[in-house]
UniProtKB/Swiss-Prot annotation:
Chain's role: Component of the cytochrome b6-f complex, which mediates electron transfer between photosystem II (PSII) and photosystem I (PSI), cyclic electron flow around PSI, and state transitions. PetG is required for either the stability or assembly of the cytochrome b6-f complex.
Record's keyword terms, sorted: Electron transport, Membrane, Photosynthesis, Thylakoid, Transmembrane, Transmembrane helix, Transport
GO molecular function, one term: electron transporter, transferring electrons within cytochrome b6/f complex of photosystem II activity
Database matches in NCBIfam families: PRK00665.1
Family (UniProt): Belongs to the PetG family.
Transmembrane segments: 5-25
Subcellular location field: Cellular thylakoid membrane
Superkingdom of the organism of origin: Bacteria
Name under which the protein is recorded: Cytochrome b6-f complex subunit 5
Amino acid sequence: MIEPLLLGIVLGLIPITLAGLFVAAYLQYKRGNQLNID
């Protein structure tokens, strides 16, 4: 049985982690375009 607290923490961290990775990838992609790096 999964503890509700642990389940809540996991469900709370997953969207934040995905959002963080997306933002980091977007910033790197944008920076790469500015520097004209392929």
